[in-house]
Amino acid sequence: MAQVLRGTVTDFPGFDERADAETLRKAMKGLGTDEESILTLLTSRSNAQRQEISAAFKTLFGRDLLDDLKSELTGKFEKLIVALMKPSRLYDAYELKHALKGAGTDEKVLTEIIASRTPEELRAIKEVYEEEYGSSLEDDVVGDTSGYYQRMLVVLLQANRDPDAGIDEAQVEQDAQALFQAGELKWGTDEEKFITIFGTRSVSHLRKVFDKYMTISGFQIEETIDRETSGNLEQLLLAVVKSIRSIPAYLAETLYYAMKGAGTDDHTLIRVMVSRSEIDLLNIRKEFRKNFATSLYSMIKGDTSGDYKKALLLLCGGED
């Protein structure tokens, strides 16, 4: 049964981009900045509406809204507001570009985005990436990664996952057996087998394969991945399995570990909260509450501070 996706941010009723542009200008003009007005306004408008405000701001004041926001705000709060202002169709592509740019590769970002986006979303990301950066996402990924990790990313980026159709029980059995043979029953691991099955079979088929695998082997597929692989490949295969089981649950877990323990991974916190605010953040909140002994709202509240915290809590949209 398909889950109905629900975001926390929707179009603001009675939206007036000129009035909003004036409110923002007033909040930034003269001495000091009225951060409260900025964050309240921007978190309650959809991304499409924020783009309209930006255009109205340019028309009314001859100024670039994003530049003004950047010069008035600082730190994590600035990063969050800048992320909210990015056109949503560009946001994932932008994050991937930055993960690949310069010295070192941010595998965490590559893994999270590429594993948790649907084939349709991945196709759109590839298109936007090429338009924006003049190079192919796939080529850039190949140039910056290696081994089976690279291979799995490329297979996912092909976005050729089978569409969900009727379940073929014989094929389910065959794939589950093949995974068992490729891992637990083999000296060493046949990574290619995992990559092909995880990267090309339909979501509903794979859910059945994971159940069947448990029956055949006595292990959850995650335990096998943990034992049979390591490093970036292990992280990616686990992210794919978790996303196949439930994207909101995978992203809830991603948020949880971004905040758990000492220090906060603010980059991840901002990326997930912003990129999912209009897609499935309500679903993520529900999974968070179900799987961890607290709510997303309380965890953000305890883990962040100041205007940054206020803005994140407004995006979160409530306690569960």
UniProtKB/Swiss-Prot annotation:
Annotated positions of the N-acetylalanine modification: A2
Modified positions (Phosphoserine) are: S37
Crosslinked positions for Glycyl lysine isopeptide (Lys-Gly) (interchain with G-Cter in SUMO2)?
K29
Cross-link Glycyl lysine isopeptide (Lys-Gly) (interchain with G-Cter in SUMO1): give the residues: K29
What would be the name of the gene that encodes this protein? Answer: ANXA5
Q: Which residues carry this modification: N6-acetyllysine?
A: K70, K76, K79, K97, K101
Subunit = Monomer. Binds ATRX and EIF5B.
For this chain, the family text in UniProt reads:
Belongs to the annexin family.
- Which InterPro entries did the record assign? Annexin, Annexin_repeat, Annexin_repeat_CS, Annexin_sf, ANX5
Q: Which UniProt keywords apply?
A: Acetylation, Annexin, Blood coagulation, Calcium, Calcium/phospholipid-binding, Hemostasis, Isopeptide bond, Phosphoprotein, Repeat, S-nitrosylation, Ubl conjugation
PTM comment, free text:
S-nitrosylation is induced by interferon-gamma and oxidatively-modified low-densitity lipoprotein (LDL(ox)) possibly implicating the iNOS-S100A8/9 transnitrosylase complex.
Organism in which the protein naturally occurs: Macaca fascicularis (Crab-eating macaque)
**What biological-process terms (Gene Ontology) are attached?**
blood coagulation; negative regulation of coagulation
Q: Where is this motif: [IL]-x-C-x-x-[DE] motif?
A: 314-320
Q: Which cysteines are joined by disulfide bonds?
A: none
Q: Can you name this protein?
A: Annexin A5
Comment, domains: A pair of annexin repeats may form one binding site for calcium and phospholipid. The [IL]-x-C-x-x-[DE] motif is a proposed target motif for cysteine S-nitrosylation mediated by the iNOS-S100A8/A9 transnitrosylase complex.
Residue spans making up a coiled coil are none
Q: Which GO terms describe its cellular component?
A: cytoplasm; nucleus; plasma membrane; vesicle membrane
Q: In the record, what terms sit under GO molecular function?
A: calcium ion binding; calcium-dependent phospholipid binding; phosphatidylserine binding
Stretch forming the signal peptide:
none
Mapped Annexin repeat ranges = 15-86, 87-158, 170-242, 246-317
